[in-house]
Amino acid sequence: MNILITGKNGFLAKEITSYYKDRADVNLILTDRKTLDPRCFLAVKDFFDNNKIDIVIHAAVRGGKRGHHPDIADIFDNLSMFQNLTRFSDKFQIMFNFGSGAEFDRARIIDSLSEDRIQDVLPSDYYGLAKNLMSRQIVSLQSNIYNLR
């Protein structure tokens, strides 16, 4: 089984890698922006044209971290990575995207919000808005792409 993990230098990717690294039945393909820039459509197209992937674990992200100064590139980069990967959903069996509580707006208390309320909120920050729009698309697609939060 070939598993593509984007954002190999991030916390989530490192944790997932440590879980799968000793499995003989799993071939991990770990990427960062130097080996596969998911913001670039042509790079993603070339990657899927030349690699057989069973599972995509999309852990690459821009923003969302403490100390990160948010800017408009947060929404552009996050949405372009997601869109470029999802355009090739016919080239893999399943994709997992990592959501965030920020999808519901960081200014809200989200403990009592149900998942179906994602359509009712629009976060005020770039990172949260990007995550919200990705979640909305995943819900509307009802395909082989899933959001983990």
Can you say where each PLM-predicted feature lies in the sequence?
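Conserved Rossmann-fold NAD(P)-dependent oxidoreductase catalytic core, especially the SDR/UDP-sugar
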Residues: 83-124, 146
